[in-house]
A protein has these predicted regions:
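Nuclease-adjacent, charged terminal/linker segments that flank catalytic cores
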Residues: 1-9
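Catalytic core segments in nucleotide and nucleic-acid processing enzymes
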Residues: 11-197
Length: 198
């Protein structure tokens, strides 16, 4: 007899919703599981990067590794430094993770090899305006005072950003596929709060 927790049951219902009502490939619907699996961080990063490329039709690159952001997302008009975190109980404010994002945003702004010899920022399109870079956290859900992490990161970098939970990420993918959201409007959603499509 399969005993499901309330959370697992809700996720199963969400998966069924996306399978029945969207054209999102099942590979991406598995993000609903990966986002809650603390042992699946790398898979979560890789599949999220592919979702941005395949469904959102943005340029994206999974970076991972030491002293690099998890994912870069861009067009020739804007760039996003994204950090993914798979947490079973949600992502709450975390000073060391905020410090890491601040470092990435500032490294991208300054673009000095002395700051980081791997020069990961060179993956971005060179045509992106200097003031059109944003930061983004992606996780299962955001709990506690995570909004403080957004406002503090913004005030420390002079850049805007956002967070998005995995359900909203898939809602956004569905809206893009149905031509109900123009992905070039993504920068308008970077208001230092959690993105909610619906």
């Amino acid at each position: 007899n399969l005993k499901l927790t309330v959370d697992e049951k809700e996720r199963l219902e969400l998966k069924e919703y996306f399978i029945s009502n969207t054209r999102i490939p099942s590979k991406y619907i598995t993000l609903l599981d990966l986002a809650y699996d603390g042992n699946a961080n790398r898979d979560f990063e890789i599949v999220t990067a592919e979702l941005f490329k395949d469904i959102f039709k943005l340029q994206s690159k999974h970076m991972g590794g030491t002293r690099k952001p998890d994912i870069l997302i861009w067009t020739d008009k804007f760039g996003v430094i994204a950090d993914t975190k798979a947490y079973s109980k949600g992502y709450k404010k975390n000073i060391s993770e905020a410090d890491k994002m601040v470092r990435y945003v500032n490294e991208n702004t300054n673009r000095n090899k002395v700051d980081n010899t791997n020069e990961w920022w060179n993956s971005f399109d060179s045509r992106i305006p200097k003031d059109a870079y944003y930061f983004l956290w992606i996780s299962s859900e955001f709990v506690g005072k995570f909004d403080e992490q957004l406002t503090e990161t913004s005030s420390r970098t002079g850049r805007n950003g956002a967070s998005i939970n995995v359900y909203q990420l898939l809602r956004g993918a569905d809206l893009v596929q149905k031509s109900k959201f123009n992905i070039h409007d993504l920068p308008n959603l970077m208001q230092n709060n959690e993105i909610k499509f619906i």
